[in-house]
């Protein structure tokens, strides 16, 4: 009976310690509020972002959200997804109600959201991605992600500050690290891809790619009334000057994706430490987005890329 009692106490303590991932923040932006919603199902990752009557996120499985992830080479040839800590959870979590990722902390008040998450590996130890075996030996990684999301930063209502810190643990060896600071999976109605030249202040049509470039990307509806883009004062990464902003169209899955990616490469090994990045996610009409990028660019100080 004593053993049973201890078991019940342990279970109760575990349940008491569980952190809810259900939250919502909001703030006025033009004719509407920007509303951001997280869920426990996704371990605090962003499930929904709405503005002016439209959903901007095509949330499905545990990969298609507004979220963060990382990829590493484990000291061998770099193969995407084979060592891939992911905020929202694992591929095996699918469309189910739970996440392999563990949410350690969440606060949401007014227009500010903060979370701390222990990321799951995208693949299970015995799984493969495009024929390539997982390099991780556990389902849950020791990689931590902290994020702070603020709607309406710097007095700009259409700008969402997206600050992330990836903690790379000790006792791992990597020569190459790829940090997807933020990615957005969007409904196919955001079918028009754009890039924005900040120097010339010029909006340019962008091909489907897929791939990355050094200029920020924006997706919009055909009527330009709804758009989402991303820009970071820290781009591009040192040594990767032609990359940083990706765009992808997945016809079969009926989803489009953009991302903001940073890279670290060191022949003797990527240091076990915190890696922090600041991005801005822009939401509104296409004009709102380009006007906001211009305003941010004018007031954001340059990032020292030798410090992290």
List where the protein language model places each region.
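Active-site/ligand-binding surface loops and adjacent short beta/alpha elements
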Residues: 181-184, 189-251
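Beta-strand-rich N-terminal accessory domains
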Residues: 17-103, 278-286, 290-302
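Acidic (Asp/Glu-rich), glycine- and aromatic
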Residues: 50, 156-199
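Extended, loop-rich substrate-binding clefts of extracytoplasmic carbohydrate-active enzymes
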Residues: 74-157, 171
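Generic recognition of long tandem-repeat/solenoid scaffolds
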Residues: 24-29, 36-37, 46-48, 111-118, ...
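Bacterial N-terminal signal peptides
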Residues: 5-14
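Beta-strand-rich recognition/accessory modules
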Residues: 18-32, 37-39, 224-308
